[in-house]
Swiss-Prot record:
Binds 1 zinc ion per subunit. This is Inactive metallocarboxypeptidase ECM14. The lineage of its organism: Eukaryota, Fungi, Dikarya, Ascomycota, Pezizomycotina. GO terms for cellular component: extracellular region; vacuole. It is found in: Vacuole; Secreted. One of its GO terms (biological process) is cell wall organization. InterPro entries: Peptidase_M14. Its main location: other. Substrate binds at residues 267-270, 325, 342-343, 400-401. It comes from Uncinocarpus reesii (strain UAMH 1704). Zn(2+) binds at residues 267, 270, 399. Its cofactor is Zn(2+). Belongs to the peptidase M14 family. Disulfide bonds join 336-359.
């Protein structure tokens, strides 16, 4: 039986299609977004020209920071031609915004970008040990460059030339409703080549996703239940799958339950994280009883999968602003709502610098657990451990983008996690599993830092990561809830599309994380893992490509680690993939 098409079809039948739209006041199916003539159906809100503010800001910057006025010529970044033009309502919201990538070489480069971004209230999209992506309007580019040292002025390239057009093209298209029979299917069930994953052919709004989750839970009630971790600021349920052999019985006779929690959608605009959690959930649910590996994992562990920890923000990205990041709660500034749900957790909460500004993208709230959803989820987790005989042993927090696997701590590089070696070992295994899927490379490092590489030579010590901060879910689950294996996975891509990842990446990214979850579970099983042929369960995006043996990658890793040791000793060796950590 082709389960997913049936589930999706029923979910769609019982869900008014109008609710899947980008406008709560003018409900239409998303296809209405796709033509210029229907541009009125696109997300709209009152919009005021920023020109006066831009001129005032530029004047202040020019006076205080002595930016030469001749630098204020309009940016010459050109937009690529497109046969489908973004309508006026999208242009009104995103204007002439672009995304620039800066190559960083030193800690001073990072500090300069942080300070300039805070001054100009810019949106930092992503950062790694080699680059930083920043969103800004074209006419702000000269102001930014004027605040940066000479080393950075020539170190930037446009990643997205026309953000408004990119946003427009990221919404579901009419063609996406026609399934492609050649698309990949569930990694946990070997269906026929004609199987079609309708649900994963495109991103889904909450109004479609929630009925789909309910239907899936009702069809597999022997090992699945739908639970609420609390309610959001606007009153929506924070819904999750609980998967296990006895999820409906909190007083089970089998003793304490080891539980793994996988979350997505903390930042509303990171749609790929939401789809990926759903993909992994579907694979686990439908694989039980058919896949030996999945059956073993569900019998040994309980799994809690939360597609979106930020349902209000997620809905807002569909109805109003595709690039909204925070939740939607009110704060002291009515015109700057929202709290960054990955900066508001209680452990080492930090409300200084830009995190104290309600208009900042990383506003941490007025205090620890100032974000409603983070507070509710933490209360649920505490209650599970204290009253429901649950021990959380694993935490995977999915984000985008930049293809990284990060482990604690995020708040500081000065304190080393007591289980560092185990965290590193499993992180390397996860990266290896992802690489076996489709040769995509995910870097591994501490969440607080990276290392700078130039060419083939190691250049200097590890750097503090630009995005590192206190109050992260990663640190709270690891330190306060004592989850031994806690990670943040930053999914595809490495910046070509950023948060606007095309729908064609949904299934490949889902497969990568599915294989990562297999590796995660295999590692936690320990001595019991050899009883299952894990290689038989691994999937690749290209079925014609044979799966490389796990030991092949292990041998490569050993070789690279040996090379890095030589590099540390005499500075001559080169390592392409090395885990660098700061141990003091």
């Amino acid at each position: 039986m082709h389960l997913l098409p049936v589930i999706t079809a029923v979910a769609l039948i019982y869900t008014p299609l109008a609710s899947a739209v980008p406008s709560s006041s003018n409900p239409q199916f998303p296809a209405a977004l796709l033509t210029e003539s229907n541009s009125a159906a696109l997300p709209t809100q009152e919009w005021h020209s920023p020109r006066l503010w831009t001129r005032l800001r530029n004047s202040i910057i020019e006076t205080i920071w002595r930016v030469p006025s001749q630098q204020r010529h309009p940016s010459r970044i050109k937009s690529p031609a497109s046969s489908r033009k973004a309508p006026a309502s999208i242009r009104a919201r995103y204007g002439d915004d672009v995304v620039l990538r800066f190559t960083i070489q030193s800690q001073s480069d990072i500090q300069a970008l942080v300070e300039a971004s805070n001054i100009l209230f810019l949106d930092i999209w992503a950062s790694t040990d080699e680059w930083v992506d920043i969103r800004l309007a074209k006419d702000v580019v000269p102001s930014l460059l004027g605040l940066l040292p000479s080393s950075l002025k020539a170190a930037s390239v446009p990643v997205i030339h026309d953000l408004a057009q990119a946003v427009y093209e990221s919404y579901p298209q009419p063609s996406s409703s026609t399934p492609n029979p050649h698309r990949a299917f569930s990694p946990s069930i070997r269906l026929s080549s004609e199987a079609q994953n309708i649900f994963f052919q495109d991103y889904q709004p909450l109004s479609v996703m929630t009925p789909w989750m309910r239907l899936l839970a009702s069809m597999f009630s022997t090992h699945v239940s739908l639970i609420s971790l609390g309610t959001s600021y606007e009153g929506r349920d924070i819904t999750a799958f609980r998967i296990g052999t006895h999820p409906m019985n909190p007083d089970n006779p089998f003793g304490q339950r080891k539980t793994i929690i996988i979350t997505g959608g903390s930042h509303a605009r990171e749609w790929i994280s939401v789809s990926t959690v759903n993909y992994v959930a579907y694979s686990l649910i439908t694989g039980y009883g058919k896949s030996k590996a999945i059956t073993k994992l569900i019998e040994e562990f309980d799994w809690v999968l939360v597609p979106t920890m930020n349902p209000d923000g997620y809905v807002y990205t569909w109805e109003t602003d595709r690039l909204w990041r925070k939740n939607r709660q009110e704060n002291n500034l009515q015109f700057c709502p929202g709290v960054d749900l990955d900066r508001t957790w209680g452990f080492e909460w930090d409300g200084t610098d830009s995190r104290s500004n309600p208009c900042s993208e990383d506003f941490a709230g007025d205090g620890p657990f100032g974000g409603t959803e983070a507070q509710r989820i933490s209360q649920w987790a505490r209650n599970q451990t204290m009253n429901n005989n649950v021990t959380f042993i694993g935490f995977l927090d999915l984000h985008s983008y930049s293809q990284q696997i990060l482990y604690p701590y995020s708040y500081s590089c000065n304190n080393i996690p007591p289980t560092l070696e185990n965290l590193e070992e499993l992180a390397i295994g996860i990266s290896r599993a992802i690489r076996r899927t489709d040769n995509e490379h995910y870097d591994v490092s501490s969440a607080c830092q990276g290392s700078v590489n130039s060419g083939k030579k190691k250049q200097g010590p590890a750097l503090k990561r630009m995005e590192s901060a206190g109050g992260s879910a990663l640190d709270w689950f690891y330190h306060d809830l004592h989850v031994r294996y806690a990670y943040q996975l930053k999914l595809r891509d490495k910046g070509s599309y950023g948060f606007l990842l095309p729908r064609s990446n949904i299934i490949p990214t889902g497969k990568e994380v599915y294989n990562a979850v297999l590796e995660f579970g295999k590692f936690l099983l320990g001595k019991e893992a050899p009883s299952v042929d894990w290689d038989a369960e691994f999937q690749v995006s290209d079925p014609s490509r044979p799966i490389s043996p796990d030991n092949e990658y292990h041998d490569r890793d050993v070789e690279h680690e040996a090379l890095q040791q030589l590099d540390d000793e005499d500075g001559e060796a080169d390592s392409h993939w090395v885990l660098r950590t700061q141990r003091s």
